[in-house]
């Protein structure tokens, strides 16, 4: 069963948006999308709060998420996390009909 992870990045002075833009421009987003088990990896900007970016990240199963977290890709992401922002998130199984998912 697919697992969707919603991550909300909030910062100041455009830091969350800059992080998402660098993830995309550096090719990191494309590399994550190419990982085995990744079904979706998309950033969305908020109309209500220009300092907030939403990442919708979907994986085939927990094993795919675990492989991603254990991969060298995580070091690439950590290196880009020099931006000042906060991250909140939650995960939902694909059959979950909760409004937040």
Predicted regions and their residues:
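Short, well-ordered beta-strand segments in beta-rich or mixed alpha/beta enzyme
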Residues: 2-10, 40-70
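Short low-complexity stretches enriched in small and charged residues
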Residues: 7-15, 21, 44-48, 97-100
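Short amphipathic alpha-helical segments
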Residues: 15-39, 73-78
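Short, low-complexity, polar/charged sequence segments that are solvent-exposed and flexible
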Residues: 24-28, 60-63, 73-76, 87, ...
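Glycine-rich beta-strand-turn "strand-cap" elements at beta-sheet edges
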Residues: 40-51, 75-101
């Amino acid at each position: 069963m697919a697992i969707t992870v919603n991550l909300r990045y909030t910062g100041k002075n455009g830091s969350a948006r800059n992080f998402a833009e660098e993830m995309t421009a550096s090719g990191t987003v494309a590399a994550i999308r190419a990982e085995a088990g990744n079904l979706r990896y998309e950033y969305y900007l908020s109309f209500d709060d220009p300092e907030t970016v939403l990442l919708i990240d979907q994986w085939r199963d927990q094993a795919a998420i675990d492989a991603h977290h254990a991969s060298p890709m995580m070091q690439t992401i950590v290196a880009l996390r020099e931006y000042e922002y906060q991250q909140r998130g939650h995960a939902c199984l694909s059959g979950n009909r909760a409004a937040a998912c």
